[in-house]
């Protein structure tokens, strides 16, 4: 187990999460007592207690007053906020994880973008205008692409779509930095934003789903061509 955290709390959190992932603390089992666990990890009980509360909020654990702390099946109890953690824990699963992320984005975007264009065209125009002044760099495009999809999600009038994008943000932008290092990916994105603006101005709302799905296929093809060289630190938080 290689843990890179720099603070005692960060170390304790990574230790427990990796122990759950590696089945040292399997789902359904009971976490060791606070005193035993704090000595095992090498942190104070106060620090450990704070970490356990945070992990419980993220769905890794269930803290029961007067009862031992239970390990959850995190696939059933956690939210989108653990995606980065999962990618960091198992680099070999990253391509499949990102494939799933892109499929979800395409499927929901086809719905919320059409709704946004139909019901909030002025806001859509404002969102798409961001693409007119973007720097031609991977970093800039990663942030732009996230902002465009998130902006269109909220422009749909259904904030749940926006909250989903919020949950994807960390991994989305980290993957985007790698994906948009390919000039063809940046060119494809600019063309896609331009096509959406054309559909908005011409009120061709019924074509939105086909355009979004076509973009999903084309961007997916570029992504698949880049998968073999995915950086091992793609899910690492920049310090």
From Swiss-Prot:
Q: Which GO terms describe its biological process?
A: fatty acid metabolic process; regulation of fatty acid metabolic process
SUPFAM superfamilies attached to this UniProt entry: GntR ligand-binding domain-like (SSF48008), Winged helix' DNA-binding domain (SSF46785)
Gene Ontology cellular-component terms for this entry are: cytoplasm
Just give the chief location class: cytoplasm
Superkingdom: Bacteria
Name where it's found.
Cytoplasm
- Annotated InterPro entries: FA-response_TF_FadR, FadR_C, TF_FadR/GntR_C, Tscrpt_reg_HTH_GntR, WH-like_DNA-bd_sf, WH_DNA-bd_sf
Which PANTHER family is this protein grouped with?
Answer: FATTY ACID METABOLISM REGULATOR PROTEIN, TRANSCRIPTIONAL REGULATOR, GNTR FAMILY
- Designated name of the protein: Fatty acid metabolism regulator protein
């Amino acid at each position: 187990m290689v843990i890179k955290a720099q603070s005692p709390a960060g170390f304790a959190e990574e230790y427990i999460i990796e122990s759950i992932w590696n089945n040292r603390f399997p789902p359904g089992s009971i976490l060791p007592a606070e005193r035993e666990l704090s000595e095992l990890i090498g942190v104070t009980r106060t620090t450990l207690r704070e970490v356990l509360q945070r992990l419980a909020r993220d769905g890794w654990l269930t803290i029961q007053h007067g009862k031992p702390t239970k390990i959850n099946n995190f696939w059933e109890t956690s939210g989108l906020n653990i995606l980065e953690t999962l990618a960091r824990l198992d680099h070999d699963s990253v391509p499949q994880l990102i494939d799933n992320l892109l499929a979800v984005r395409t499927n929901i975007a086809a719905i919320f973008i059409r709704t946004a264009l139909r019901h909030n065209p002025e806001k859509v125009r404002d969102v798409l205008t961001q693409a007119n002044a973007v720097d031609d760099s991977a970093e800039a495009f990663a942030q732009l692409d996230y902002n465009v999809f998130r902006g269109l999600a909220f422009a749909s009038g259904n904030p749940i779509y926006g909250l989903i994008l919020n949950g994807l943000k960390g991994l989305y932008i980290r993957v985007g930095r790698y994906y948009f290092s390919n000039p063809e990916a940046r060119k494809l994105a600019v063309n896609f934003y331009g096509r959406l603006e054309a559909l908005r101005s011409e009120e061709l709302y019924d074509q939105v789903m086909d355009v979004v799905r076509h973009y999903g296929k084309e961007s997916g093809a570029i992504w698949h061509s880049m998968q073999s060289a995915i950086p091992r630190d793609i899910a690492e938080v920049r310090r």
